[in-house]
A protein has these predicted regions:
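C-terminal edge-of-domain segments
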Residues: 64-106
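General beta-strand structural signal in soluble alpha/beta enzymes
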Residues: 26, 74-76, 193
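A structural-propensity feature for long, helix-poor, extended segments
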Residues: 23-70
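Alpha-helical support elements that line or immediately flank enzyme active sites
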Residues: 2-16
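Short glycine/threonine-rich loop-to-helix capping motif typified by GTGT followed
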Residues: 2, 33-43, 85, 170-174
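Non-transmembrane, aqueous-exposed alpha-helical and coiled segments at domain scale
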Residues: 15-19, 23, 85
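Short secondary-structure junctions
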Residues: 16, 67-71, 150-154
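A conserved regulatory-domain signal marking ACT and ACT-like small-molecule sensing domains
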Residues: 103-205
Length: 206
């Protein structure tokens, strides 16, 4: 369940605030629908989504903690277009019930994971590097984003889906991204989401 917990934790990281409602939708042809309770994936996903790290002993109580806190984490199955046995889409909802965003995820074994889609954009998150994602829906938003990115000397790549442009920006662990986070809520910016490093770092022998 460590991979599932990290998927949930990274999803919460991308959201940038507490998650009160989410659907975890399993690929119906994958292994999750028949194994997620027995293998503890329900505790993993729920714990991560409510902010419990994979290494935290509270993970085993995550489902009851979520219930006590009034959070609604629902498990479903659907056809997602089978790509991996441990494939799940997570839909995050605001308190008023409207969908905020979705991610497509794979738990790949050994506590490792991949997030391959953010809304309809193709991305690559595995928890080992820091990235920020800026989605612009107007030319004004694009101009604001590029000024902020140039200010911190960042490199970036872009992709366009349905009149929206996503900037994918790799960051160093110490790179200050306040000017990028300040884009939230600005005209033409539909979202700014950050992926932090969450995988355990191998300690060097002294």
């Amino acid at each position: 369940s460590a991979g599932c917990a990290r998927i949930g934790f990274m999803t919460r990281c991308l959201y940038g605030k507490d998650i009160t409602q989410a659907d975890v939708v399993f690929e119906e042809l994958g292994s999750y629908p028949s194994t997620y309770v027995g293998q503890g994936s329900n505790f993993g996903f729920t714990g991560g989504l409510i902010g419990i790290p994979a290494e935290d002993p509270r993970l085993k109580d995550a489902v009851s903690i979520a219930k006590e806190q009034g959070r609604k984490i629902v498990f479903k199955k659907a056809s997602l277009g089978f790509k991996h046995p441990n494939q799940a889409r997570i839909d995050v909802f605001a308190a008023d019930g409207h969908k905020e965003f979705s991610v497509m995820t794979y738990s790949i074994g050994g506590g490792m994971f991949q997030i391959t889609e953010l809304d309809e954009f193709q991305i690559a998150i595995d928890g080992s590097s820091r990235q920020v994602f800026i989605c612009c829906e107007t030319s004004e938003g694009i101009a604001l984003a590029e000024v902020a990115l140039e200010r911190i000397g960042a490199a970036w790549s872009t992709q366009r889906v349905k009149n929206r442009t996503l900037y994918t920006v790799p960051l160093t662990r110490t790179q200050n991204c306040d000017s990028i986070l300040a884009l939230r809520g600005q005209p033409g910016i539909s979202f700014v989401r950050i992926a932090e490093v969450i995988m355990p770092v191998a300690r060097k022998a002294v």
